[in-house]
């Protein structure tokens, strides 16, 4: 059996070029994702500041995801992704300069997180909509799964490389991790110049000048209201995005405080922080590989449900855990469950929505997940600061569990889709 038989998206030269370049870039991104919150916690010692950075990074999604979804449908998606990737590269190099020069302050991190979030709010929608233009609809589920695979493989490699850099470079490891992220963007940007989109709708730019954003957004909302399955997926995504998904932002506080040992040094805490991110990445990678290899499975709703309930239950268990090895296992399962449910949500939406509405509907889904996240980040950060990190995990996990039970009992269409 050829690789392209199991992974049909790899039969596309254009997708493969983009896929490889993005993998290198995502590895750098996860080096920054591991380093930035740890640096912020080292500067302030505040769980609330971790939530504030999450708020700053995700607020642009609340503001831009919906109009961005309309605009993306009228723009060249490949060129849009290139522009946003360049902005993200500049952000990484600015962070590197500030950290290496010793000028870094917490307000720099918050402001640059907002800049990164602004680019991400548009780039994610454009990139997801570009996938079908690279591979066509038959190979789309596999392309989505392969995208998630490299994202989560990068979640493993990024923290591992970060740990090595922080151990080897005594005083400026964070700055060099940011610099490596900036360099990594060159690979995906360069690759995109060699990529073509053979399945693209060439009429996307014809009506850009006459685009009526409120009217077109309303068309997307009408479709969602008339499709109960898509509506429920978006509602669940929003609830989890507020009470559950922001918790991993507290990993530096877990590494430093919840798992504190009498023999701790800065290097030990740094290594523990990287290990927790690594564990989450391994769990996420396992989920992505499974879904990639078996993207043809019909019962996608079942895996979504298992991932949702596992995520909420594990979050509750995290609240009662002080053992380092067991915490590593739980964080790994947290990564697996989070990726499983989000990949299935993404796939169900991409397959169920017509081409003409995909950008708008996906932007609503993205808004549901990340648009509410700024306030979820503040809530979880405030709760962790006021009551404790374990208490924040307990409240978030319990509320997610209660909502999932209610939704699955109240709306039988979910059970019908799962079976």
Feature roles, as predicted:
Residues 36, 122-135, 340-353:
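Intracellular juxtamembrane helix-capping segments at the cytosolic ends
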Residues 44, 76, 98-99, 103, ...:
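Helix-breaking motifs and short loop linkers at transmembrane-helix boundaries and internal kinks
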Residues 2-62, 222-280:
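Helix-loop boundary and gating motifs at the non-cytosolic
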């Amino acid at each position: 059996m050829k690789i392209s038989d199991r992974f049909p998206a790899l039969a596309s030269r254009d997708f493969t070029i983009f896929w490889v370049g993005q993998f290198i870039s995502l590895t750098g991104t996860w080096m920054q994702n591991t380093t930035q919150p740890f640096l912020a916690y080292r500067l302030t010692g505040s769980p609330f500041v971790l939530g504030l950075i999450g708020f700053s990074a995700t607020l642009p999604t609340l503001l831009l995801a919906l109009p961005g979804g309309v605009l993306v449908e009228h723009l060249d998606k490949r060129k849009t992704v290139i522009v946003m990737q360049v902005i993200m590269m500049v952000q990484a190099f600015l962070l590197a300069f500030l950290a290496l020069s010793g000028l870094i302050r917490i307000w720099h991190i918050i402001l640059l997180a907002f800049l990164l979030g602004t680019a991400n709010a548009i780039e994610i929608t454009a990139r997801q909509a570009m996938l079908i233009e690279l591979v066509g609809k038959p190979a789309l589920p596999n392309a989505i799964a392969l995208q998630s695979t490299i994202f989560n493989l990068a979640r493993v490699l990024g923290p591992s490389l970060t740990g090595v850099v922080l151990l080897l470079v005594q005083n400026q490891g964070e700055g060099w991790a940011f610099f490596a992220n900036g360099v990594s963007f060159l690979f995906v940007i360069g690759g995109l110049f060699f990529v073509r989109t053979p399945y693209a709708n060439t009429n996307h730019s014809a009506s850009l000048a006459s685009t009526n954003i409120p009217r077109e957004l309303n068309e997307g909302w009408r479709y969602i209201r008339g499709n109960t399955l898509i509506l429920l997926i978006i509602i669940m995504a929003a609830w989890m995005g507020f009470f559950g998904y922001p918790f991993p932002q507290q990993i530096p506080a877990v590494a430093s405080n919840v798992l504190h040992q009498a023999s701790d040094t800065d290097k030990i805490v740094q290594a523990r922080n990287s290990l927790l991110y690594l564990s989450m990445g391994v769990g996420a990678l396992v989920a992505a590989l499974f879904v990639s290899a078996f993207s043809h499975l019909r019962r996608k709703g079942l895996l979504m449900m298992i991932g949702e309930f596992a995520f909420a239950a594990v979050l509750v268990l995290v609240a009662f855990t002080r053992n380092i090895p067991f915490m590593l296992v739980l964080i790994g399962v947290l990564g697996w469950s989070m990726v499983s449910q989000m990949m299935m949500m993404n796939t169900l939406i991409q397959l169920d929505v017509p081409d003409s509405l995909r950008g708008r509907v996906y932007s609503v889904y993205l808004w549901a997940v990340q648009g509410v996240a700024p306030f979820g980040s503040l809530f979880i950060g405030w709760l962790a600061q006021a009551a404790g990190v374990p208490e924040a995990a307990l409240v978030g996990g319990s509320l997610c569990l209660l909502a999932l039970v209610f939704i699955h009992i109240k709306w039988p269409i979910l059970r019908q889709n799962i079976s």
